[in-house]
Swiss-Prot record:
Residues 212-221 are vesicular. The modification N-acetylalanine is found at residue 2. GO terms for biological process: protein transport; response to salt stress; vesicle-mediated transport. GO terms for cellular component: Golgi apparatus; HOPS complex; plasma membrane; vacuolar membrane; vacuole. PROSITE patterns: LONGIN, SYNAPTOBREVIN, V_SNARE. Keywords: Acetylation, Membrane, Protein transport, Transmembrane, Transmembrane helix, Transport, Vacuole. The gene is VAMP713. This is Vesicle-associated membrane protein 713. PANTHER family: SNARE PROTEINS, VESICLE-ASSOCIATED MEMBRANE PROTEIN 713. It comes from Arabidopsis thaliana. Disulfide bonds: none annotated. The longin domain is critical for the vacuolar localization. It is a single-pass type IV membrane protein.
């Protein structure tokens, strides 16, 4: 799965988050939030850790962050962040400014999950990201090492469950299962129709024999 973790925060107050697998990305993300510049100027940032990158979009004091596999590039993660920012602002509006930590999590974590799945697995997401990826601020985002940004003497270890692709595989399995059920349903329908036709033919032949002819002359005088 390309995008593994995401959160929405006001300053350092996390309002909603979702993780597609077992990882300590949440605690690392909170440290990133604490180290972001204090002003509320709009910005786009990326921080690398092993083969993962934390992408950050800050707009109007609202921060949207995601952790993605480095193979996802920049366009898809930032298109995802832009999408999430728009959805969050549209859904909660002014309530964002006074919301308590995780007060939107029960509802919006489902949106994060759905959009993470879409941007990680749906081919249409790549086309959308190419359009949004033309923004100069995305092209010019510098990727810094996260240990340098957090100014830690010891190496920060990111822990990610090796089964991180499970959700993507589950999504594909569900699609295949639905397709298989549809095929089996049509097969059963066709088989039922064929049995009805065969039964009708057998009844007709029997009646034709009893009624002395294909036009059933002795039965319909």
């Amino acid at each position: 799965m390309a995008i593994i973790f995401a959160l929405v925060a006001r300053g350092t107050v996390v309002l909603s988050e979702f993780s597609a697998t077992s990882t300590n990305a949440s605690s690392i993300s909170k440290q990133i939030l604490e180290k972001l510049p204090g002003n509320d100027s709009d910005s786009h940032m990326s921080y690398s850790q092993d083969r993962y990158i934390f992408h950050v979009k800050r707009t109007d004091g609202l921060t949207v962050l995601c952790m993605a596999d480095e193979t996802a590039g920049r366009n898809i993660p930032f298109a995802f962040l832009d999408d999430i920012h728009q959805r969050f602002v549209k859904t909660y509006g002014r309530a964002i400014h006074s919301a308590q930590a995780y007060s939107m999590n029960d509802e919006f974590s489902r949106v994060l999950s759905q959009q993470m799945e879409f941007y990680s697995n749906d081919p249409n997401a790549d086309r959308m990201s190419r359009i949004k990826g033309e923004m100069s601020q995305v092209r010019n985002v510098m990727i810094e090492n996260i240990d340098k940004v957090l100014d830690r003497g010891e190496r920060l270890e990111l822990l990610v469950d090796k089964t991180e692709n499970m959700q993507g595989n589950t999504f594909r399995f569900r699609k295949q299962a639905r397709r298989y059920r549809t095929i089996m349903w049509w097969r059963n329908v066709k088989l039922t129709i064929a049995l009805i036709l065969v039964l009708a033919l057998v009844v007709y032949i029997a009646m034709a024999f009893v009624c002395h002819g294909p036009s059933l002359p002795s039965c319909f005088k």
